[in-house]
Amino acid sequence: GPLMARVRSVARAETDAPIVHAMYDLIFGKGVDPAVDGARTTTGSPGDWWTTHALSPAVLEHSVQGFVLYRDPNRAIDPELRELAQARVGWSSGSTFVYSQHVQSMRGMGMDPRKIADLTAWHTSDAYTTIERAVMAYADAIALDGGRVSDELFTVLKDHLTDEAILELTY
């Protein structure tokens, strides 16, 4: 089963780590204790990702810094392409949590609902541009093929993205 169901959650009262309290407040509401109250995120996901990461405040903080990086407006990768890739990796790897979180993010960005709906069967959809299709193929190569990316696919990525954007997409 998933890791989050196998390691214990950290109740608010168990820690004085500022990052844990700040994230619990942000994600679940001021003063809510998701480990005790069984609270869900605003997107309806179980809160156990947050409550298990609270076992190590340093790991939680590192994860949060990644979110800040992704949302930095100075990123080279288009945020919609990044979200398509992350949602696709979630779907391909069978992670309902990752998939649902990134679908919610795409909705929040105002992405075309058809692109969101067709994500699971992107190969047969005409909703996507060439680069969007390449990004999802790249995500599948990373998630399903051990990172083996064909020269043809990489050429399409290079035709549309800078090296910096490809690095950010991969990260």
Residue ranges and their predicted role:
Residues 61, 83-116:
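Conserved alpha-helical segments that form or flank metal/cofactor-binding pockets of metalloenzymes
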Residues 3-81, 107:
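Secretory/endomembrane lumenal or extracellular ectodomains immediately following the signal peptide
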Residues 44-52, 78-92, 124, 165-171:
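Alpha-helical scaffold segments that form or flank carboxylate-/histidine-based iron centers
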Residues 120-129:
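Acidic/His metal-coordination segments adjacent to aromatic residues that form catalytic metal sites
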Residues 77-78, 110-114, 162-163:
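Helix N-cap / loop-to-helix initiation motif
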Residues 131-171:
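Acidic/histidine-rich alpha-helical segments that form the ligand environment
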Residues 61-75, 118-121, 151-159:
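Short amphipathic alpha-helical segments and their helix-coil junctions
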Residues 40-41, 58-64, 94-99, 143-151:
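Short acidic alpha-helix initiation/capping motifs at coil-to-helix transition points
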